[in-house]
């Protein structure tokens, strides 16, 4: 029968070095008889302290003194003396903190899941009630999102190698034994699975195990391109709504804990445009709030043009923070979201912990030239003139939403729409294919998410962001001479042919603490086009410049 499920042990397989490998390493370091600590670990067999720990009958802090006593008894039997400073707690604290995700093994699991395999973790583990328990929580939180099932011995009251846990596994997978491959680093844990008819792989080193896994599955797992970062499934996310004024609410998706980071998308997009950044930033230790900007998705979309001027939008973002009890947040924007976050830094610097923009530069207002004059002088912005008349662009963009998003969401090395002479041509899509090919950046399922979102909101609200040029200019002129002094990041994309990198060349004159990132071979849709590079740049900057300062009570 064909394999269709892959099961991975945690300790020694998905996470290295194995925690319980510390027993042998400690024996060697302290010149103790070989096997002494392992004997103490297994003392009592099915009724012993370790089995009770793994079944969740006692916690790790309860187990530690029992293990200390077992070590003392075993050392007396062996007629050896343990060092005076011998501490099982210290030994296991260090071993647990040293354990990291085995990335090649995780990548193999991701590849198998992508190819249609059901994946699971089957682990003997414990209830961790130590002061240092957050490390295990972080490890499990990151791993869980990549697997269909997680079976923890301490939660189900069964342990490997007891036969019943393997039957429980098969019931959970809804699979027959011959459809399952199981990887573990302990031979005794593999035997019952093999006796049932599962394919088993003993993991002694990762490369050898993956070669064997390749062989039994027929799927290439080694020397493959690095996978895309973890994405978001909209139905699995936590969705929130904040009413910022009567009849206007903002929708957001939230993940993670730590300093707040507000992600602000551009036109014509969605919170979902940050789908590759949300898990990465959350895993890096931030509370991510990915916005549906006003006019989009599940946020309110009032029809009035003035509802979308920057002054109103920024005031509403401040109210959003107020309603969530956030004194400050990091603001990261792209496209129009980038424009908004620069305005937040200018007019509400006390509420902005740090600010970053992808593609959109900060350019101070020119009091001697209105923005419409500037746009008319630059042919690449001709499409923005086409967007000015209410109803015209809406009709074209809403006519066939699938065509709209497939035409717009293109990588820089694919055929892209020209933004020149849009008014003269009478539309964005004139002479473009009725059925555009799908970009390598997106899947059909992702395109359909945008289609469904814009069926709800339409394009009037999103286009109204373009129809406040004069209002935004007059407001911006109030900040003439003002500098942005908070931590800031500008990320340019080499092949964005509208927001070209050269537009950002004088930003240091106005933002003295500006840091920069640059992504080569990247077009306008930066988060989708180069998600790995975006994540690396953002996390490095956040960790160095955007961690919250200590909170001092004013009570």
From Swiss-Prot:
The modification N6-succinyllysine is found at residues 55, 421, 455, 554. It comes from the Eukaryota. A lipid is attached at residue 522 (S-(15-deoxy-Delta12,14-prostaglandin J2-9-yl)cysteine). The active site is at 335 (nucleophile), 466 (proton donor), 524 (proton acceptor). It catalyses: an epoxide + H2O = an ethanediol; (9S,10S)-10-hydroxy-9-(phosphooxy)octadecanoate + H2O = (9S,10S)-9,10-dihydroxyoctadecanoate + phosphate; 12-phosphooxy-(9Z)-octadecenoate + H2O = 12-hydroxy-(9Z)-octadecenoate + phosphate; 12-phosphooxy-(9E)-octadecenoate + H2O = 12-hydroxy-(9E)-octadecenoate + phosphate. Residues 1-224 are annotated as: Phosphatase. A motif (Microbody targeting signal) lies at residues 553-555. Gene3D superfamilies: alpha/beta hydrolase (3.40.50.1820), HAD superfamily/HAD-like (3.40.50.1000), Putative phosphatase, domain 2 (1.10.150.240). The modification Phosphoserine is found at residue 370. GO terms for biological process: cholesterol homeostasis; dephosphorylation; epoxide metabolic process; phospholipid dephosphorylation; positive regulation of gene expression; regulation of cell growth; regulation of cholesterol metabolic process; response to toxic substance. The modification N6-acetyllysine is found at residues 43, 191, 215. Residues 259-531 form the AB hydrolase-1 domain. The N-terminus is blocked. The covalent modification of cysteine by 15-deoxy-Delta12,14-prostaglandin-J2 is autocatalytic and reversible. It may occur as an alternative to other cysteine modifications, such as S-nitrosylation and S-palmitoylation. Keywords: Acetylation, Aromatic hydrocarbons catabolism, Cytoplasm, Detoxification, Hydrolase, Lipid metabolism, Lipoprotein, Magnesium, Metal-binding, Multifunctional enzyme, Peroxisome, Phosphoprotein. Changing residue 522 to S: Loss of S-(15-deoxy-Delta12,14-prostaglandin J2-9-yl)cysteine-induced inhibition of epoxide hydrolase activity. Changing residue 55 to R: Decreased phosphatase activity; no effect on epoxyde hydrolase activity. InterPro entries: AB_hydrolase_1, AB_hydrolase_fold, Epox_hydrolase-like, HAD-like_sf, HAD-SF_hydro_IA, HAD-SF_ppase_IA/epoxid_hydro_N, HAD_sf, PGP-like_dom2. Induction: By compounds that cause peroxisome proliferation such as clofibrate, tiadenol and fenofibrate. Substrate binds at residue 383. Its cofactor is Mg(2+). Inhibited by 1-(1-acetylpiperidin-4-yl)-3-(4-(trifl uoromethoxy)phenyl)urea (TPAU), 1-cyclohexyl-3-dodecylurea (CDU), 12-(3-adamantan-1-yl-ureido)-dodecanoic acid (AUDA), 1-((3S, 5S, 7S)-adamantan-1-yl)-3-(5-(2-(2-ethoxyethoxy) ethoxy)pentyl)urea (AEPU), N-adamantyl-N[']-cyclohexyl urea (ACU), 4-(((1S, 4S)-4-(3-((3S, 5S, 7S)-adamantan-1-yl) ureido)cyclohexyl)oxy)benzoic acid (c-AUCB), 4-(((1R, 4R)-4-(3-((3S, 5S, 7S)-adamantan-1-yl)ureido)cyclohexyl)oxy)benzoic acid (t-AUCB), 4-(((1R, 4R)-4-(3-(4(trifluoromethoxy)phenyl)ureido)cyclohexyl)oxy)benzoic acid (t-TAUCB) and to a lesser extent by 8-(3-((3S, 5S, 7S)-adamantan-1-yl)ureido) octanoic acid (AUOA). GO terms for molecular function: 10-hydroxy-9-(phosphonooxy)octadecanoate phosphatase activity; epoxide hydrolase activity; lipid phosphatase activity; lysophosphatidic acid phosphatase activity; magnesium ion binding; phosphatase activity; protein homodimerization activity; toxic substance binding. Belongs to the AB hydrolase superfamily. Epoxide hydrolase family. PANTHER family: EPOXIDE HYDROLASE. This is Bifunctional epoxide hydrolase 2.
């Amino acid at each position: 029968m064909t394999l269709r499920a892959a099961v991975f042990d945690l300790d020694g397989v998905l996470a290295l070095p194995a925690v319980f490998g510390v027993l042998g390493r400690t024996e060697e370091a302290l010149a103790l008889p070989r096997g002494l600590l392992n004997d103490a670990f297994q003392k009592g067999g099915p009724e012993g302290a370790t089995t009770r720990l793994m079944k969740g009958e006692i916690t790790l802090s309860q187990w530690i003194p029992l293990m200390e006593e077992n070590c003392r008894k075993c050392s007396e039997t062996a007629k050896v003396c343990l060092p005076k400073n011998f501490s099982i707690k210290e030994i296991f604290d260090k071993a647990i903190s040293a354990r990291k995700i085995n990335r090649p093994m995780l990548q193999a699991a991701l590849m198998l899941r992508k190819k249609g395999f059901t994946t699971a973790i089957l682990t003997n583990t414990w209830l961790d009630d130590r002061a240092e328990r957050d490390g295990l929580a972080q490890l499990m939180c990151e791993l869980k999102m990549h697997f269909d099932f997680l079976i923890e011995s301490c939660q189900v009251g069964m342990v490997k190698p007891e036969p019943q846990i393997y039957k429980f596994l098969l019931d959970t997978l809804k699979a027959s034994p011959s459809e399952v491959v199981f990887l573990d680093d302990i031979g005794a844990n593999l035997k019952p699975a093999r006796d049932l008819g599962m394919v088993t792989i003993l993991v002694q080193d990762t490369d050898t195990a993956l070669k064997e896994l390749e062989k039994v599955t027929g799927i290439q797992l080694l020397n493959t391109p690095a996978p895309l970062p973890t994405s978001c499934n909209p139905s699995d996310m936590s969705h929130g709504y904040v009413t910022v004024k009567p009849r206007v609410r903002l929708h957001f998706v939230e993940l993670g804990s730590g300093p707040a980071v507000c992600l602000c998308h551009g036109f014509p997009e969605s919170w979902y445009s940050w789908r590759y950044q949300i898990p990465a930033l959350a895993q890096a230790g931030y509370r991510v709030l990915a916005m549906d900007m006003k006019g989009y998705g599940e946020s309110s979309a009032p029809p009035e043009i003035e509802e979308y001027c920057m002054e109103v939008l920024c005031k509403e973002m401040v109210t959003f923070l107020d309603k969530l009890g956030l004194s400050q947040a990091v603001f990261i924007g792209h496209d129009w979201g980038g424009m908004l976050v620069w305005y937040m830094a200018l007019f509400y610097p006390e509420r902005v912990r740090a600010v970053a923009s992808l593609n959109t530069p900060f350019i101070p207002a020119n009091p001697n030239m209105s923005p419409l004059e500037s746009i008319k002088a630059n042919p690449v912005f001709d499409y923005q003139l086409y967007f000015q008349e209410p109803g015209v662009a809406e009709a074209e963009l809403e006519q066939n939403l699938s065509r709209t998003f497939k035409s717009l969401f293109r990588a820089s090395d694919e055929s892209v729409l020209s933004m020149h002479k849009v008014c003269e041509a009478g539309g964005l899509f004139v002479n473009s294919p009725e059925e555009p090919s799908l970009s390598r950046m997106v899947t059909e399922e992702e395109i359909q998410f945008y289609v469904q979102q814009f069926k709800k909101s339409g394009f009037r609200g999103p286009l109204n962001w373009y129809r406040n040029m004069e209002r935004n200019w007059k407001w911006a002129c109030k900040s003439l001479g003002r500098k942005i002094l908070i931590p800031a990041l500008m990320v340019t994309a080499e092949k964005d042919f509208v927001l070209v990198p050269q537009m950002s060349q004088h930003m240091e004159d106005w933002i003295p603490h500006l840091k920069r990132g640059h992504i080569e071979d990247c077009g306008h849709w930066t988060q989708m086009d180069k998600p790995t590079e975006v994540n690396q740049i953002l996390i490095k900057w956040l960790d160095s410049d955007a961690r919250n300062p200590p909170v001092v009570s004013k009570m």
